[in-house]
């Protein structure tokens, strides 16, 4: 009788160990799947970082380009501020140079310099939390 109870105890212990082994295998499979998902998240995070770096570069370029918009104001277009700058440069150049005949290219350049510059194109970029 003691022998049968010992066999029954060992069977219960064996069943318990089989159950623990099955749970361990499930846990191992879930951890492997989690590892794959974490690796994918890491890859996606690197991709997002690259995209954000590209957008940062684009925004910096737009910012630098918009600085050139500040060169002339609307009032400058009305008064022709660029023409007075060009005339001042031409007068200094005429004093420095000897009296030589002007070529047709110089005349064309001078005429183009007297025309008002075209305004820059305005670009609107949605940056963050921009409410429409």
UniProtKB/Swiss-Prot annotation:
Biological process (GO), any one: cell division
Keywords of the record: Cell cycle, Cell division, Centromere, Chromosome, Chromosome partition, Coiled coil, Cytoplasm, Cytoskeleton, Kinetochore, Microtubule, Mitosis, Nucleus
Compartments, as annotated in UniProt: Nucleus; Cytoplasm, Cytoskeleton, Spindle; Chromosome, Centromere, Kinetochore
Stretches for region Disordered: 81-132
Bias kind Acidic residues: ranges: 94-105
Coiled-coil region(s): 21-50
Gene Ontology CC terms, in alphabetical order: cytoplasm; DASH complex; microtubule; mitotic spindle midzone; mitotic spindle pole body
Record's keyword annotation contains Transmembrane helix: no
Domain of life: Eukaryota
Record's function text: Component of the DASH complex that connects microtubules with kinetochores and couples microtubule depolymerisation to chromosome movement; it is involved in retrieving kinetochores to the spindle poles before their re-orientation on the spindle in early mitosis and allows microtubule depolymerization to pull chromosomes apart and resist detachment during anaphase.
Entry-linked PANTHER family: DASH COMPLEX SUBUNIT DAD2 (PTHR28036:SF1)
Homology family: Belongs to the DASH complex DAD2 family.
Quaternary assembly: Component of the DASH complex consisting of ASK1, DAD1, DAD2, DAD3, DAD4, DAM1, DUO1, HSK3, SPC19 and SPC34, with a stoichiometry of one copy of each subunit per complex. Multiple DASH complexes oligomerize to form a ring that encircles spindle microtubules and organizes the rod-like NDC80 complexes of the outer kinetochore. DASH complex oligomerization strengthens microtubule attachments. On cytoplasmic microtubules, DASH complexes appear to form patches instead of rings.
Protein name: DASH complex subunit DAD2
Originating organism: Kluyveromyces lactis (strain ATCC 8585 / CBS 2359 / DSM 70799 / NBRC 1267 / NRRL Y-1140 / WM37) (Yeast)
């Amino acid at each position: 009788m003691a022998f049968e109870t010992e066999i029954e105890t060992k069977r219960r212990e064996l069943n318990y160990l089989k159950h623990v082994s099955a749970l361990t295998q499930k846990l191992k499979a879930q951890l492997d799947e989690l590892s794959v998902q974490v690796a994918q998240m890491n890859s996606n995070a690197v991709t997002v970082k690259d995209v954000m770096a590209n957008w940062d570069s684009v925004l910096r370029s737009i910012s630098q380009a918009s600085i050139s918009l500040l060169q002339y104001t609307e009032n400058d277009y009305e008064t022709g501020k660029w023409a007075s700058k060009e005339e001042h440069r031409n007068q200094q150049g005429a004093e420095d140079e000897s009296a030589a005949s002007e070529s047709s290219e110089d005349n064309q350049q001078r005429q183009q310099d007297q025309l008002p510059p075209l305004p820059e194109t305005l670009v609107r970029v949605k940056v963050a939390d921009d409410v429409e």
